[in-house]
Amino acid sequence: MKVKTIMLLFQILAISTIKSADVPNRYIQENVAVRGKATQSTLPSGAGAVLSLPGFAIDGNRDSDFSHGSCSHTTNSPNPWWRVDLLQLYTITSVTITNRGDCCGERISGARILIGNSLENNGINNPACSVIGSMETGETRTFHCPQPMIGRYVTVYLPKTEVLQLCEVEVNALLPVN
């Protein structure tokens, strides 16, 4: 156990000095969100609830049409958030988000992508990887962290009263090549 812990610390130190665009040869980037469990601040009620589940944002499907059942969707509420528990620590370099494509693309403006190990305040107190200034309706964009970040929880937090809708969230982590 001590050897594994020491090796993990050396790996963390080695990759903490690289920028997200510079992936060392002994590592690959992989979307680890599909392995996780998603939750969100609220769920719509009624017929729309079945199309709004938080897990739809990590199903590996970038379909941006809400009616196709591959997007998460909160209610219109103050400070909505969506979070994926990656179930273990990862070194995260970037997060790729697909915005809703059939309407309302402007709703995501100002959202913050937060990464860390704390669930305090629903993960909103974790450090920021990036802020979404604006996105086109249906756009898929990768947001690079200024440096690799180690964390278990990735939260998308919208600091205003609005609906938060995410059609895909991909968490790009460095994994050692075996």
Swiss-Prot record:
Keywords: Calcium, Disulfide bond, Lectin, Metal-binding, Secreted, Signal. Parenchymal hepatocytes. Alpha-L-fucose binds at H73, R100, R107. Residues 1-20 form the signal peptide. Disulfide bonds join C71-C167, C103-C104, C129-C145. One of its GO terms (cellular component) is extracellular space. Coiled coil: none annotated. It is found in: Secreted, Extracellular space. It comes from the Eukaryota. One of its GO terms (biological process) is regulation of innate immune response. Ca(2+) binds at D59, N61, S70, C167, E168. Pfam families: F5_F8_type_C_2 (PF22633). One of its GO terms (molecular function) is fucose binding. Residues 29-178 are annotated as: F5/8 type C-like. A motif (Cell attachment site) lies at residues 100-102. Acts as a defensive agent. Recognizes blood group fucosylated oligosaccharides including A, B, H and Lewis B-type antigens. Does not recognize Lewis A antigen and has low affinity for monovalent haptens. Belongs to the fucolectin family. Binds 1 calcium ion per monomer. Homotrimer. This is Fucolectin-1. It comes from Anguilla japonica (Japanese eel).
